[in-house]
Each structure stands twice: as C-alpha cells, then as structure tokens.
Amino acid sequence: MAAAAAPRSSGKEALPAALGSASEPPRLFDGTTRLYICYFCPFAQRAWIIRNFKGLQDKIELVGIDLQDKPAWYKEKVYEQGTVPSLEHNGKIMGESLDLIKYIDSHFEGPALLPEDPEKRQFADELIAYANAFTKALYSPLISKADLSAETVAALDKIEAALSKFGDGPFFLGQFSLVDIAYVTIIERIQIYYSHIRKYEITNGRPNLEKFIEEINRIEAYTQTKNDPLYLLDLAKTHLKVA
C-alpha cells in the first residue's frame, strides 16, 4: 500500500459552538452533508480525523453536539440512538464510528485509507473488528478501579505485536490507514489516564507503540482534532469516575 498523502491544511479550523438543549436543529436533509460530533468524544474523533485527512472540510459540515446538555431534537429528528458520531448524507443518517470511517473512505474523494493488498486488507479487517474489545480491555479496569489485569496487558501487547507485522512504516499496515484511526483516539486517552492515575506508562517495553504515537502526532489531520490532555483527564475523572 503506497503512503496516503493528506491534502495540505492551513491548521485548525474554526469550530462551531456545540449545540445544547436550547438550540434549534439545522435544516435537515437540505442536501448538506453533516457530521454530528462531540469535540471530546473518542468515537466521534475517528470520523473527524478521516474527514480532515481526506480534505473534506468543505464537503462535510461539522455540527458539534453538547453531550452534557444534549438537545432533544438530536435524538428525535437526527439519530434515534442519540449517540455521536452520526453522518447525514444523501438523505440518510448513519452512525457507529467504525462503520462511518469505512463509509467516508469509500464514498468520498481523497486518499484511500484501506489497502488493495489482500494480506493487509485481511489484517485491517481483523484489527478493526478487535477495536471495541481493545477499548473495553483498557477502560474496564479504570472504571471499576480494579488492578491492572492480565487482559489489559495482553491487549496492549497485542497491538504492540500488530505494529511489527509490516516493516514499511510505523503504522499498523505500515502506512497510515483506517486501522490507525480506529485505535489512535483510544490510545491517546489511555496513555493519559494510565500515566496520571495508575502511574503506568503504556509505552514502556513497547517500542512499536512508542514509535506509533510519535509518528501519528506528525499527522495534522489527527492533531487538529486533539484536546488538551489535562482537559481529557478532568473529563474522565468527572464523568467516568476513574480517579
């Protein structure tokens, strides 16, 4: 898979204010493609990253949703599950972040983020399918305040090994792909949480993961979507009760 080159960017875009309970909905199904996100949600961040990487800022409008003061119209008129992200496109609404990143990759212009190589494609499918289990393995001990489990360590070791499968780059498939988008928003947060709360550095003894984090922070489409680490830590302590 050749390296996917992201379109040039002028830096962070001016984000619209997140819409709360007192807000009015946008004019739905008026032909505008809209991506509904929460600016600090790791799942919504996945869709936000691919939008930016493919250079779709002028094609997909961001609509921020305040999850702490969620507007009733979002669940009633937009996405009945009430979660983010969701995408309004061609008169339809769809959700689930791992499905959305695949949809955006295949239905919009810009660099392709899944490989044609059959071996890499199969590995990509396997890793994307594992992403939810990885998230659960890393978040569960934090939320339950349990000790660092063998399952948690095994999940980190699994992605460390996965990052060594292909030698043509620092990412899961060598070059940047949907797999990296599926994992980076979770890795971003667990690195902060485990370091500050458990005094455990997830990169210790995992050089591939350390290199992955270093290199993905050179990708502007990702860094444009990041929040301040201490802000994310405060949110986790407040809303997930992880402290």
Swiss-Prot record:
Positions annotated to bind glutathione: 70, 84, 96-97
SUPFAM superfamilies reported for this sequence: GST C-terminal domain-like (SSF47616), Thioredoxin-like (SSF52833)
Occurrences of domain GST N-terminal (ranges): 31-112
MF GO annotations: glutathione transferase activity
PROSITE patterns: GST_CTER, GST_NTER
Chain ranges of the GST C-terminal domain: 117-240
Signal peptide bounds: none
InterPro entries per UniProt: Glutathione-S-Trfase_C_sf, Glutathione_S-Trfase, Glutathione_S-Trfase_N, GSTL1/2/3, Thioredoxin-like_sf
Family: Belongs to the GST superfamily. HSP26 family.
Protein's name according to its UniProt entry: Protein IN2-1 homolog A
Organism: Oryza sativa subsp. japonica (Rice)
